[in-house]
């Protein structure tokens, strides 16, 4: 009972409050300081976004990471996320990786606690200790990830498996520890405590979000991850998350990830000494039942706790082909083209994509003051306390997350049955009266969204009675007669969030009807002696309330007296040899689940251990351009509204020297270039409406063809037809109408950009391809056109047309 009570107490009484929130100046200084050591990297800093399963390699062919899409069974991620979501709590320990703010993060499994004020080292984490009976819910997830790791990186898995002490394994795997992150955009960092001889794994186990790709900062490669995806990677490379992609600050999203690793300090001599000390004590205790009779020490390798050496890569769109599992059949030919593209001053990129792969004087990047703080979603707003608790964003966000702890299932393990029954009945009574009042209000005004609180109504009386019960619940959780002001503020914020959620979810009221602010005002009434209307009540009612309050207090005191006689276990002082007491078998067959080893074999079937070499065979490439509507060059002198051409955003876009070169250059598709050979690569050119007949190509490049097709259905049909002529990868080259920094910008600035961007890119398309009114689309709109799997995106750096190359597998 104590572990659950301790967890509730920690979560309710230990989180940011208005008094604890630093000033705006202090937060700004902390943000700047954090970024010096751990900068954030946005999408604009990367060149490649890898969407599909792939093996990423560095400049010497060493594996950076292996990405596998939808590789985890849904039952495993669902079961694990249901338990592990509670492990991610506000912690200042990782604030340096979150711009100085406390992110939602936590650890589970076993941990060394080296350098920590925790006295007892090398043991179960508090989370696993307190959730030992439920801990097996994570075993299927851990088993599947381990077998996938073993399949794709067998030598590293074996080294890790040989080094990890058996008593700190999670369900027999080579993982000792899990790190759980919720809504946490990490700044650039390495995982210094992970075992040097192995790899770590990360899985997204729950979420509904866009963006937040895992980026390998030194390689300029992003890996967007979604639920059930797994990445086996060298965590000693610097990595971070790109920006969250939301359209407005109120947009709902969630993201829960889990990192699996062997914490190498658990295999050092000091940890083995701790294991043996505990085991010796257990063997002298007749009541103890250790699961092993001895501790076998293993070689732990040499762990330097330093970043891995970086051997840079010079990616091109064709090099990406060689990394993608789905395109392995054309990888060797892709590398042949890549090697020609990588030659300094090679004209091949312009022939294929219409421009160079990189441009140093393209559209200028944004100033820092034009961008949102990288941790904006987790940062707290200024405190505007107006009642029983602070209304800072940090407090309200945390309170909503913890409101579940006032449900019956949680409280039943923390307070007496008598006090719990009072809480349940008082809450039910108040909700019943709220429902009655709300039904009456919407009967006369169906569109109503605000709840009119009547201060002398039975509902108001029931609310204050519920507050009296809640106050005793709070004191029962604290095990004392009075709470500090800070403890009260913390509890009342959770209490209000709990009632707000109950009204929204159970009574189906609009979110704003029973708002947190409204409840806060009423809690202020309660804090002023119970209610400011008490003196106006009849004497009999006043006496009834006093007696009711006394009975609730007595129920809580009886609960406290009963608990004083119970033996309690405390994680901080737990010195037992309780390693592996949580372990048990998983009945995969009984549940009808795939056996992890066989499942891993299936989901890794397309993974190839050896790096591919470039072929010497002939490579056929077709470049398709939009046919110009006439033989005349596109007219740049098109009349545009003055409010567009004089806007700050238009002036900024037009200030680029690269943009001015596009406007002055010859139209790219007035005539077709003659077919030619560049070493082993045969280049063929065609207009979009006169493709070669009865010919097939290894690669086809559609150069801004879809922007000449305003109808989405026509564009999709055109892409579908490419299957008949392309045997390898289809490259779709298009403008992304949203700039690369779009989702980092302050929202008003996005509106200003949106007002001019379509006209700006239409102007460039008229000059470059003669397209009268190009249909420039957003990333999401372009990708929605594809009837095939989009495996990756290659972003031409500094491109004046914001050009992106999409790699499609024509399966």
UniProtKB/Swiss-Prot annotation:
Cofactor(s) demanded: Fe(2+)
Subcellular location: Nucleus
Any GO molecular function: thymine dioxygenase activity
Cofactor: binding comment: Binds 1 Fe(2+) ion per subunit.
Site annotation Involved in J base recognition, conferring specificity towards J-DNA: residues: 525
Family: Belongs to the TET family. JBP1 subfamily.
Protein name: Thymine dioxygenase JBP1
Organism: Crithidia fasciculata
Record gene name: JBP1
